[in-house]
């Protein structure tokens, strides 16, 4: 497995025994799902909690959300059966572009079919059925994970008791789509891209690093960068912020795949909870959000420039049984991965919306 160094030893794997059909009509054979679980499923199978990760995340939620785990915390293994799976199309154990195509015996690469957020959620549902989970107390996630939580409420309303979408919108904005496209173009401009048919020993790392640098700039905020870096120089006489972004770009190339980045950002751009559910106009979008009946804890980050708070306010206004809570932070979009004590407190204080 190509990125096995970044998959924890506790990760488990489930392989589907039947073909998995995507929304596009394309079919994947032998799909594998990488997942982690904590706690025990009760006899009724109704104490499930599903954590959905973001763009470059993995199933190791107890690593990237560690302060939220434990007795008296948002994720309590003594009470709940908690599951986090690596999403379809990723490179941390679940079938994606780096997976060997059983037909060609080579990695899928650029030939991996287009996927959607709904495809990701439907695969999670297959996994949970295999695990015996009958219903979920709540589904939670930030950013791309928040998109999944919204789709869970709409695709499986009888299985999901509550949801907690964090720092996300009901449909990807032109702002987000434009930023994603700029990042993809950076990858395409790398000579090693080769139309996506690069070898895994010579990937387009320069382009992927630049894409990550762009993304990191939107994951933080003006206050965050100004306070942390200002106009400081590092020992090599670069601006400290330039060194930081270059470091973050290099780090991603060591643990992530460019085709995977392309596939997942396209899936995010396609995010629209009203797509194919009703005619594509504003009133129908509003009616789809209005059809979500589950108690919903919407978390907005006041300094988020990627998914600005107006988008979470829209969710809270249109979902009938929703509560808007504010994660106040200078860290921008990534505050849900940085200010975790504050996030845990928000979840704990809103137990009527995140059902325990």
UniProtKB/Swiss-Prot annotation:
Its EC number is 2.3.1.31. It is found in: Cytoplasm. It catalyses: L-homoserine + acetyl-CoA = O-acetyl-L-homoserine + CoA. It comes from the Bacteria. One of its GO terms (cellular component) is cytoplasm. Keywords: Acyltransferase, Amino-acid biosynthesis, Cytoplasm, Methionine biosynthesis, Transferase. Pathway: Amino-acid biosynthesis; L-methionine biosynthesis via de novo pathway; O-acetyl-L-homoserine from L-homoserine: step 1/1. It is an enzyme of class 2 (transferase). Substrate binds at residues 212, 334. The active site is at 143 (nucleophile), 304, 333. GO terms for biological process: homoserine metabolic process; methionine biosynthetic process. Pfam families: Abhydrolase_1. GO terms for molecular function: homoserine O-acetyltransferase activity. Residues 49-337 form the AB hydrolase-1 domain. Transfers an acetyl group from acetyl-CoA to L-homoserine, forming acetyl-L-homoserine. NCBIfam families: homoserO_Ac_trn, PRK00175.1. Belongs to the AB hydrolase superfamily. MetX family. Homodimer. PANTHER family: HOMOSERINE O-ACETYLTRANSFERASE. This is Homoserine O-acetyltransferase. The gene is metXA.
């Amino acid at each position: 497995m190509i990125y096995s160094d970044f998959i924890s030893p506790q990760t488990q794997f489930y392989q589907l025994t039947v073909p998995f059909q995507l929304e596009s009509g394309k079919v994947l054979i032998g799909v594998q799902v990488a997942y982690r679980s904590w706690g025990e499923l009760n006899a009724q199978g109704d104490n499930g909690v599903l954590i959905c990760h973001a763009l470059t995340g993995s199933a190791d939620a107890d690593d990237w959300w560690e302060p939220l785990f434990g007795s008296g915390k948002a994720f309590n293994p003594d009470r709940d059966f908690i599951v986090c799976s690596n999403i379809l199309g990723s490179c941390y154990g679940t079938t994606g572009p780096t997976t060997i195509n059983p037909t060609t015996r080579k990695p899928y690469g650029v030939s991996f079919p287009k996927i959607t957020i709904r495809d990701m959620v439907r695969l999670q549902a297959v996994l949970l059925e295999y695990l015996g989970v009958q219903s979920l107390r709540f589904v939670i996630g930030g950013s791309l994970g928040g998109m999944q939580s919204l789709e869970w409420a709409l695709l499986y309303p009888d299985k999901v008791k509550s949801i907690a979408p964090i720092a996300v919108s009901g449909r990807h904005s032109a702002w987000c789509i434009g930023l994603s496209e700029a990042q993809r173009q950076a990858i395409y401009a790398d000579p090693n891209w080769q139309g996506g048919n690069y070898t895994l020993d010579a990937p387009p790392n320069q382009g992927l690093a630049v894409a990550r640098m762009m993304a990191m700039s939107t994951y933080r905020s003006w206050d965050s960068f100004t306070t942390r870096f200002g106009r400081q120089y590092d020992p090599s006489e670069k601006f400290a912020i330039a060194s930081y972004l270059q470091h973050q770009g290099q780090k991603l190339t060591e643990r992530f795949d460019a085709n995977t980045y392309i596939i997942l950002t396209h899936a995010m751009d396609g995010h629209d909870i009203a797509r194919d559910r009703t005619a594509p106009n504003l009133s129908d979008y509003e009616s789809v959000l209005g059809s979500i009946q589950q108690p919903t804890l919407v978390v907005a980050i006041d300094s988020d420039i990627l998914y600005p708070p107006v988008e979470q306010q829209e969710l809270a206004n249109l979902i009938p049984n929703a509560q808007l809570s504010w994660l106040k932070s200078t860290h921008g979009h990534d505050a849900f991965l940085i200010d975790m004590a504050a996030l845990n407190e928000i979840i704990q204080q809103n137990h009527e919306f995140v059902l325990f």
